[in-house]
Amino acid sequence: MNEVAGFPTRAFGDDGIIYIFKSIAATMHAMNKIIVEKPTSYCEAVLRMEKTSVHRVYHDNHYGYTIEDDNELFGRLILEINQAGLSWTTILNKQDNFRKAYHQFNIKKVAAYKEADRQRLLEDAGIIRNRLKVDAAIHNANIVLQLQKEHGSFKKWLNTHHPKSKMEWMKLFKQTFKFTGGEIVNEFLMSTGYLPGAHVESCAIYKKALKSKPAWKNK
């Protein structure tokens, strides 16, 4: 995922259409020749979708909201890591499969995975069968366990380091975890409320997300 002018630029497919946000483009209506501008933010594009769309459900109820539970924070990190090189639509469509395959994102259970579990994941067509990403999930689970011992919880570790600039967060995650490049870290922190940008202020969900008291509002 890239970022332009402070907004996330997720690429995703919906009904065969790939949107690249913050691009200035238009399409010609086949019947009446009306020029229609493409959405300028993830929020604008998603709010044009059906309420049952996986993007709409995620955007309206999860994206940019505070997460208190360590397992859910870890699960979000797994999903963001697996999105690398793929569309977010693919990950959202497989999120229930990920949850099941990784034992509800239970950190202790994932940290204890052995070779048999690794092979099980690599053979599971319901998730992303990438060895580097699977290995990163197991490795990172063990790192989170250590952070819990040292700080009380994964959440408290994040809070201890907040606030940081995006570049500072990227450096910290690179030093701490595996497979956490800049865009993965940026999206993880925006999606969990540590960095701003998940919703534009004109978005109908902006104020709703603020009610969850995201960390970026309390610097």
Describe the predicted segments one by one.
Residues 7, 12, 19-21:
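Aromatic (phenylalanine/tyrosine) cluster motif
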